[in-house]
């Protein structure tokens, strides 16, 4: 079993805004800021290795989702001249079960579906959907309202953004505290700004 004191030291810089629901069973490491009305399920992992992670308001991070700000494959973490790059996540995004997200910039109203994998060099704008099991590791900016789908990661543009998961967030904020212990909110000087 892991050393409990090691887990506490890794979570010193975790800031959770009032109104966020973050389950104790989630794994949050490094300098992470979580905005109000964001729900983090048990077994979700948010790991800030190469720089801070700032998560905006109203995001839904489901079980076994991995949001990680890691070093690029060609850099070692002990290199002194590496500047930490923040990962900024906007508002009303959904990270579904088992997805992996390394993108340093994510706009608003995006959905990363189950088992999808978004690489570090990708920049998601707003209103995008990355379909189940789709992998994007190209160095590009995904245009607004793009849907990536299918085994060949085909693309199309939808006319409207995905609807925010307001009702689901309200339901989870009411139900999760009944069945899971929550991490304490930390009052900070300010909540994450809208991007």
Swiss-Prot record:
UniProt keyword Ligase, yes or no: no
InterPro entries: DCTN6, Trimer_LpxA-like_sf
One GO cellular component, as annotated: kinetochore
Keywords, alphabetical: Centromere, Chromosome, Cytoplasm, Cytoskeleton, Kinetochore
Gene Ontology molecular functions: dynein complex binding
Claim: Cytoplasm is one of the keywords in the record: yes
Predominant subcellular localization, coarse grouping: cytoplasm
Signal peptide annotation: none
Subcellular location: Cytoplasm, Cytoskeleton; Chromosome, Centromere, Kinetochore
Biological processes per GO annotation: mitotic spindle organization
Superkingdom as given in the UniProt entry: Eukaryota
Assembly and oligomerization: Member of the pointed-end complex of the dynactin shoulder complex which contains dctn4, dctn5 and dctn6 subunits and Actr10. Within the complex dctn6 forms a heterodimer with dctn5. Interacts with plk1.
Sequence similarity: Belongs to the dynactin subunits 5/6 family. Dynactin subunit 6 subfamily.
Function according to Swiss-Prot or TrEMBL: Part of the dynactin complex that activates the molecular motor dynein for ultra-processive transport along microtubules.
UniProt-recorded name of the protein: Dynactin subunit 6
């Amino acid at each position: 079993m892991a050393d409990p004191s090691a887990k506490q030291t890794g979570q010193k810089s975790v800031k959770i805004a009032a109104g966020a629901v973050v389950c104790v069973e989630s794994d949050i490491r490094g300098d992470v800021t979580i905005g109000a009305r964001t729900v983090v399920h048990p077994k979700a992992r948010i790991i800030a290795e190469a720089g801070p992670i700032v998560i905006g308001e109203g995001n839904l991070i489901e079980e076994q989702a991995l949001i990680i700000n890691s070093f690029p494959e060609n850099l070692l973490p002990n290199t002194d001249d590496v500047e930490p790059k923040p990962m900024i996540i906007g508002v009303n995004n959904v990270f579904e079960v088992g997805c992996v997200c390394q993108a340093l910039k994510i706009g608003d109203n995006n959905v990363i579906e189950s088992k999808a994998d978004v690489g570090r060099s990708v920049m998601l704008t707003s209103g995008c959907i990355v379909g189940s099991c789709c992998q994007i590791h190209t160095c590009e900016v995904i245009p607004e309202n793009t849907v990536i789908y299918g085994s060949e990661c085909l693309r199309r543009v939808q006319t409207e953004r995905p609807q925010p998961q307001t009702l689901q967030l309200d339901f989870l904020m009411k139900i999760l505290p009944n069945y899971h212990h929550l991490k304490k909110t930390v009052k900070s000087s300010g909540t994450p700004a809208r991007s």
